[in-house]
Regions:
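Active-site-proximal loop/turn and secondary-structure-junction residues that shape catalytic pockets
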Residues: 14-17, 56-60, 92-96, 126-130, ...
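Histidine-acidic metal/acid-base catalytic patches
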Residues: 34, 38-42, 48-50, 105-210
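Aromatic-lined substrate-binding rim segments of carbohydrate-active enzymes
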Residues: 1-5
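Hydrophobic residues within beta-strands of alpha/beta enzymes
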Residues: 9-11, 52, 88, 149, ...
Length: 210
């Protein structure tokens, strides 16, 4: 892929297969998660990846009456163990995916202000913004906490050409010109190339109308 001019900017689903470990469950679980993330960090470094995404809801399900401080301290510890060129981005996972901690962009941004580490940032995700009806103007107040950006659609299907997507993609372009935008689509066994092609066509149509 290097010889063909491809660059890998981000890694998603970094904790796939480790869903049983939860940052709120125990110190043992947090240490195991940290160990996995250290290994992912090395893989990302070797691939030249800039962003790794913390997104799985099962790794962060918050039990009743537990303090956010457990998570704040955990992500500060992660910060110390990342390569200087790698940023971990926390993705908001809406409640419809059985998540109850950092479910929307506003919550993630407020949390990151408490973590206060330059290499622990927010991943803007178009699908999450749509599901949560996030306030785009609020996001701009915390612009320095934005790391990676995913253009995705509901249920991770192909990116549609519609007014809501136009509004959000135009917001991304207008306010995050220096960022690399990546398309996130869930693969299937039948028509991956077709879904990717149609998504790129629809995104280009939106960009050209901007």
């Amino acid at each position: 892929w290097k010889n063909k001019g491809f660059k890998i900017y981000g890694m998603q689903s970094i904790l796939y297969g480790y869903e049983d470990f939860n940052i709120f469950k125990s110190e043992l679980d947090r240490n195991k998660l940290l160990g996995v993330i250290k290994k992912i960090n090395m893989v990302a470094k070797n691939l030249g990846v800039s962003f790794i995404t913390f997104g799985c809801p099962k790794n962060r399900f918050q039990f009743k009456n537990q303090s956010d401080n457990l998570a704040i301290d955990f992500f500060r510890l992660i910060s110390k163990n990342l390569d200087k060129n790698i940023t971990l981005c926390i993705e908001p996972i809406p409640k419809i995916y059985n998540n109850n901690f950092l479910t929307n962009t506003k919550d993630v941004l407020k949390f990151l202000k408490k973590v206060n580490k330059k290499n622990i940032l927010c991943q803007l995700d178009m699908s999450a913004i749509k599901i949560n009806n996030d306030n785009l103007n609020y996001i701009l107040k915390f612009k320095k906490y934005i790391g990676h950006i995913h253009i995705s659609d509901i249920n991770l299907g192909k990116i549609q050409y519609n007014e809501e997507n136009k509004r959000i993609i135009n917001f991304f372009i207008e306010n995050f010109k220096k960022k690399v935008f990546t398309i996130k689509i869930l693969g299937n066994k039948e028509s991956n190339l077709e879904r990717i092609s149609k998504s790129i066509t629809n995104i280009n149509r939106i960009i050209n109308e901007f």
